[in-house]
A protein has these predicted regions:
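C-terminal region of N-terminal signal peptides and the immediate post-cleavage residues
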Residues: 2-3, 8-11, 19-42
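Hydrophobic alpha-helical membrane segments, chiefly transmembrane helices and signal peptide h-regions
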Residues: 13-26, 52, 72, 76, ...
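Primarily hydrophobic membrane-targeting regions of prokaryotic envelope proteins
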Residues: 1-2, 6-11, 17, 71, ...
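Feature marks extracellular polysaccharide-active and adherence modules
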Residues: 56, 63, 68, 74, ...
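N-terminal segments that cap or nucleate solenoid repeat domains
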Residues: 33-82, 218-220
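Leucine-rich solenoid repeat scaffolds
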Residues: 169-220
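Acidic/polar low-complexity surface segments
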Residues: 97, 101, 116-130, 159, ...
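Short, solvent-exposed linear patches
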Residues: 116, 143-144
Length: 220
């Protein structure tokens, strides 16, 4: 297997690892690892890492990682997290794709906004992306490439707003935002989604209030 050369630039603040920026450098071939929703990895990271991490370009894949820090995904970049533990928040704005699979854990919140590609945070159905554990809130706002939030245990609130169906040749089941089979500790709020969200006949457990669109139903 050939490996993409990559650079991790680390800034030191007060003697601690502060920021790690992942940037792919051209190489003869990409890492031969396909990840659901994000395509082929251009940079793969495994093992322990301390400090905040920014996925700057290409597709960054975290496999069996324990990260003590937050993650930011830059516009146009993609991130896949599989079998990993993140002790911090995850924030994406304008990402090309985001995947969170196979019992991964996040110690903070997940915020995904204005993404142009598919967002897969666990699959509550029969897919290959098992849900994970998210201690904080989940916010999904103004994404246009398809969204699925399934089979997760979520400690905080879930807010799903202004997401629109992807255009061009997507499966029917991916046209609407899917929120299915989650256990949600906080509120579930949906608004302004086109079309309205579906639970794909796999209800969610919500320990607080449910409001907006289909999400307001006690059977959603």
């Amino acid at each position: 297997m050939t490996h993409v050369q990559h650079r991790i630039s680390i800034l030191l603040l007060a003697g601690a690892l502060a920021v790690a920026t992942i940037a792919a450098i051209p190489a003869t071939a990409a890492v031969a690892a396909d990840t659901p929703g994000t395509g082929t990895c251009t940079t793969t990271i495994t093992g322990p890492l301390t400090g905040a991490l920014t996925a700057a370009v290409g597709t960054t894949c975290l496999n069996n990682v324990v990260l003590h820090g937050a993650i930011t995904v830059n516009p146009g970049a993609a991130l896949s997290i599989v079998d990993s533990t993140i002790y911090g928040a995850i924030t994406t704005n304008g990402a090309s794709a985001f995947t969170f699979c196979n019992s991964s854990t996040v110690g903070g919140a997940i915020s995904v906004a204005t993404s142009t590609g598919f967002i897969l945070i666990g699959d509550g159905g029969e897919g290959t992306c098992a849900g994970g554990h998210i201690d904080g809130a989940v916010t999904l706002n103004a994404n246009s490439g398809g969204v699925e939030l399934g089979g997760n245990t979520i400690g905080g609130a879930v807010k799903v707003s202004a997401n629109v169906a992807p255009t061009g040749g997507v499966p029917v089941e991916d046209a609407a935002t899917e929120i299915e089979g989650n256990s949600i500790g906080g509120t579930l709020t949906c608004s302004g989604n086109t079309p309205v969200p579906t639970n794909d006949m796999t209800p969610n457990t919500v320990n607080s209030s449910r409001t907006g669109e289909t999400c307001a139903s006690s059977t959603f």
